[in-house]
Amino acid sequence: MRIAVPYDNGTICAKFTDTEVFKLYDVVNKKVAFTQLVHPTGKSHNVLAGFLADQLVTCLICDEISPEAQTALDDWGIQLYAGCAGSADDRAAELLAGTLHASFSTARSSHHL
């Protein structure tokens, strides 16, 4: 599993399409094994969704996201947890622990974490 978070100086970037950097979390056995920062190749929701798919992202944690971006992520098979703010590392840890509070999610279940 690979989690992506729009990243801004340790916190989740407020708007998905405003992000300059994504923090990626590679997960093995429900634990973060590796993280890295990657710079997207564009700003539109379709470009960002395709970029994340190219990075083999399976799950996105973010704050604000448009319905069009939600559709683009769904088209690429990327699960979405939206309405999350604060520390990127803390939200990723909460997702893995099953305690993440998102205002919107496309996740069907968490059995594959």
Where are these regions (language model features)?
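N-terminal first-folded block
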Residues: M1-P40
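Short secondary-structure boundary segments
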Residues: Y7, D63-E64, C84-A85
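Compact, glycine-rich, soluble single-domain proteins
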Residues: F34-D54
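Short Gly/Pro-enriched loop/turn and capping motifs at secondary-structure junctions
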Residues: K43, I65-P67
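Short active-site oxyanion
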Residues: L56-L60, I78-L80
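C-terminal structural segments of small proteins and small subunits
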Residues: P67-H112
